[in-house]
């Protein structure tokens, strides 16, 4: 299992292309407070990164071409968030440089782990560094929001409490627990979950302090379990070991443990026909840890 570990000497000697992490995220809780007139939902959610995810290899080109490999089976390159992020940064900064981008995709799509958003954020943050385009984190987050609601969280690179439609962000320091994360063999459309008439949409807003000091939950869970028995089955299995719930709109579920040994013991009992991993929660993104060491 590949986790993100960096030493200063390793990075100093790193050959091109540079290799940047795109960590997964978990929604430790997710509450839906209402639906706005524009169709978007008001949320309160707590994001934390985990020490596991995709990789993006980047080689700077002297021309302004953006080349992304490999092309994902279900997605044209022009629609891939990595490609779109690179083009957006290039256009907004009038950068004359280009890049060869190679995405090592480990996280499944439609999983609730934020893989696509993390890929886009890594492209923005890493290219801003390599191209020396000198945008601030705030400016990069603004570009990220044009690509997806979760992208700014990954751009900021810090565990955070998000409100509204995800645009109001408060940095947070939840406990860095160990997680078993599993994905049943289904993909779930976020739009389908949010349009379901049975979705809870009226959870009262609470302060961050109140939310952090009560049992965590996910308002999307009931709808997802009703429609996807595979998710229900895997969640029940995890609940035998530890507090467990859905992340985002699924399909992934996670169980939280206080130490790695307990998490590994539970993980070893799970049938191997699921995508899954054990990883520690991180309040600072591995991407930002890496950049802090090489800049």
From Swiss-Prot:
SUPFAM superfamilies: GHMP Kinase, C-terminal domain (SSF55060), Ribosomal protein S5 domain 2-like (SSF54211). The active site is at 25, 150. Its EC number is 2.7.1.148. Disulfide bonds: none annotated. GO terms for biological process: isopentenyl diphosphate biosynthetic process, methylerythritol 4-phosphate pathway; terpenoid biosynthetic process. The keyword ATP-binding applies. Pathway: Isoprenoid biosynthesis; isopentenyl diphosphate biosynthesis via DXP pathway; isopentenyl diphosphate from 1-deoxy-D-xylulose 5-phosphate: step 3/6. Gene3D superfamilies: 3.30.230.10, GHMP kinase, C-terminal domain. One of its GO terms (molecular function) is ATP binding. It is an enzyme of class 2 (transferase). It catalyses: 4-CDP-2-C-methyl-D-erythritol + ATP = 4-CDP-2-C-methyl-D-erythritol 2-phosphate + ADP + H(+). ATP binds at residues 108-118. Keywords: ATP-binding, Isoprene biosynthesis, Kinase, Nucleotide-binding, Transferase. Catalyzes the phosphorylation of the position 2 hydroxy group of 4-diphosphocytidyl-2C-methyl-D-erythritol. Belongs to the GHMP kinase family. IspE subfamily. HAMAP family: IspE. This is 4-diphosphocytidyl-2-C-methyl-D-erythritol kinase. It comes from Pasteurella multocida (strain Pm70).
